[in-house]
Amino acid sequence: MSTPTPTPTPITFPSATHTLSAHLYHHPPTNTTPTTLTPAIILSHPMTGVKEQTTTLYATHLHAAGFTTLTFDAAYQGSSTGTPRGLEDPFQRVEDIKAAVTYLSTSVPGVDSSRIGVVGICASGGYACFAAASDLRIRAVATVSAACVGGMCRCGGVGRGLREDGGVIGMSLEGARGERNGVNWDGEEAPKMFDAERVLQDGGEGGNVDSFFKAAAEYYGTERGRHERSTQRVPLQSYDRMVVYDSFAFMRLIAPRPVLMIAGEEAETLHYSEEAVRLAREPKELFVVKGMGHFDLYDRLEVSGPKLVRFFREALA
């Protein structure tokens, strides 16, 4: 018998000058447990994603295990405020996570502010690590299919390793310069990072990067992950922000708080998790899920879900 999916409480909270739209899955105090405090976990969505996709699946799974959980749309994205729509600002994304910690710590009855963890998925895996490095309120951090948007913009994509490419960097900066001096894209006019419909029609092409976007289209362009507010449109002025950002530069500062990085054995992004764990100090763990790729872990939780429960039960005890 399956457990019914809980109905979240829609809430908003501030992050810098923005108002973020969020869903709270709460275990509030009751008449029989008025002083009981529960640990809480923040779930942060992938680049071009929204809170109703993969983070909801992980939030409900962790909520069923006894945690209060919170999902939210990043500034400029989903139902949150900010223009240009779709802007990917890594430093604002990090602030959004810290703002979520503040909200849980100060505004949700029954949450133990000393036991707050974060799960970041894809690009948010990088943002979660960066936030934890400088925010001691985050007691534990876990990632699923982590990636670094800065690394992608400097090296030429997810499957190009960690070696920077001057030509790729130049293209990123030129695109941003042109947009800043020309069209002020809104959410409908900004270019798509990838066109899910076209990729699905064409069937993808060979090579690591192409296979990544084919798998992305199979998630974002089908019932698995399609959502009207997840448009994959990214203003070009995002790229000069991303080029100078490094998700994992300060991994060493997270210790002695624990780090768990979950990645698929077949994921083109696996090298990001490997490098991040190499840079981190104990306690740390790289957990590789056999037979799975990057996007498989977005909605196949049979291995990653229980692993996260075990990790946070120990880390937030």
Where are these regions (language model features)?
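Alpha/beta-hydrolase fold nucleophile elbow
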Residues: 109-122
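Short beta-strand/loop motif that positions the catalytic acidic residue
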Residues: 261-263
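Catalytic histidine-centered segment of alpha/beta-hydrolase-like enzymes
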Residues: 292-302
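N-terminal cap/lid segment of alpha/beta-hydrolase-fold proteins
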Residues: 1-36
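The serine-hydrolase catalytic nucleophile loop
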Residues: 47-60, 74
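Conserved alpha/beta-hydrolase
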Residues: 61-81
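Alpha/beta-hydrolase active-site loop
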Residues: 54, 87-109
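Alpha/beta-hydrolase-fold enzymes
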Residues: 129-218
